[in-house]
A protein has these predicted regions:
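Asp-box/BNR beta-propeller blade signature and adjacent active/binding-site loops
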Residues: 1-199
């Protein structure tokens, strides 16, 4: 169900530097809101954080309104998440206590069309983000692209487009393995496309 700690919703679990597990989670009933489930016993039990809500908009609220489907990484400064929103941009929130509490989300400046994202941190600290960089709520889910950050997510640059054809290419998942990015995403909601990119 949607209540209580459950583990991840869409995006992958992150093992933190203290050995605990952090699972990104969200609810899409009414106001969209996200939270994290944290486990200190290898997933036997989970503790849910407080909801992470967007600040109130200056104008009329879009429907739906809020943030869902966080994607996580950890570095020396703390634990961080990018959030899917209905605001035309990905939002970012940060934690200084290993995911127990989170800052109020703020725009990352990365255009997003209210479509799923995923990211991974390489061993050298570089972040790779797969997303639809289209700044319109419910906008076209093409292209699907790969962005890169070398400064902990403060700035992002376009690395490559995975697909630019018209259509729907969304819900990416990204892993790092043996010097390669392993990426999947939907293809027209009919099948799954897979990429292996050696870096």
């Amino acid at each position: 169900g949607d209540e209580g700690g459950r583990g991840p919703v869409r995006n992958k679990i992150l093992r933190l530097s203290d050995g605990s597990l952090l699972a990104p989670a969200s609810i899409e009933q009414g106001e969209w809101r996200c939270f994290m489930d944290r486990s200190e016993d290898e997933g036997e039990t989970w503790t849910r954080t407080a909801d992470i809500r967007l600040p109130e908009p200056a104008g009329e609220r879009p429907n739906p309104y809020g943030a869902i489907q966080p994607s996580l990484w950890e570095d020396e400064a703390g634990v961080h998440a990018l959030l899917r929103t209905s605001q035309g941009y990905l939002y970012r929130t940060d934690s200084e206590d290993l995911g127990r509490s989170w800052s109020q989300p703020a725009s990352s400046g990365i255009p997003n069309n209210n479509s799923g994202i995923d990211l991974v941190k390489a061993p050298d600290g570089t972040l790779y983000l797969a997303c639809n960089p289209v700044g319109e709520n419910w906008g076209a889910r093409s292209p699907i692209s790969l962005l890169i950050s070398k400064d902990g997510g403060a700035h992002w640059e376009h690395l490559t487009h995975l697909v630019t054809m018209p259509g729907e290419y969304s819900y990416p998942a990204v892993l790092w393995q043996d010097g390669c990015l392993l990426i999947t995403h939907t293809w027209q909601r009919k099948s799954i496309q897979f990429w292996k990119i050696r870096l």
